[in-house]
Amino acid sequence: MSSRLAGQVAIVTGGARQIGFAIASRFAAEGASVVLAQRSRDEGEAAEAAIRTAGGEATALTCDVADEDSVAGMVGRTLDLYGRLDVLVNNAGTGVAEHITDLSWDDYRRVIDINVGGVLLGTKYAARQMKVSGRGGSIINISSIQGVLPLRQSAVYAGSKGAVNLITQQTAADLGCFGIRVNAIAPGYIDNEMMHSYHTLVSETPGAAISAARGSIVLGRLGTTDDIAGPALFLASSDSAYVTGTLMLVDGGSQTHGAIA
């Protein structure tokens, strides 16, 4: 690796699983000290051990991104451990696949509190430290193709990711004067647990639905979590020093086909 993040400290919320773990692992391989902010202590510690075994530096901290005290404490603990904060990846998220006529308000609150509230809280406390440091920083929000592309039974999840897209633009405008860049990545069909769960819920034949989704993608394949880690590294590094307020679609070209599920 090229050590593009040598000496930097990065927080990845939801960093112990799936896309979050791929990003955290890539950052650590590039020289960053990575904090894995995860609700599950066991998952966080397992991810920390995996990164350390691979030669990286990582620390798992328990955090509920929907709880302000928990987020504030996690950022404070990061500073206690490493003395600085350069990158925040607001990756933690959740979803629900419900038809709007059957929507549970409890599900609505859970999705919005985590997907929208978690981004706002993480940005609030990370940006405070980045501002004080005078070094600026990079905040990366993990959105979704569903924030720009209609999919079935996704009103709440899609709405939450649409909000993330606008929050990204607004906070980029608010924080640019402090040298803090804010960008978002919108993954498309990523071959992971969340994507398979979605199709199991909304389709009677999930295997056929996934095959149809694959066929609608210009590049002809589902994405991998590593396909998201690479763009995240770009946005975290100085290679993207003049990039802010941007939504990067990482979807293999699926957005060119309109609604695809």
Regions found by a protein language model. Name each.
Residues 89, 176, 181, 243-245:
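Short, small/polar-rich loop/turn modules that mediate ligand/substrate recognition or access, typified
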Residues 99-100, 107-112, 213:
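Substrate-binding pocket helix/loop in short-chain dehydrogenase/reductase
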Residues 144:
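Residue(s) in the substrate-gating loop at a strand-loop-helix junction
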Residues 149, 232-233, 244-261:
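Short C-terminal tail/terminal secondary-structure segment
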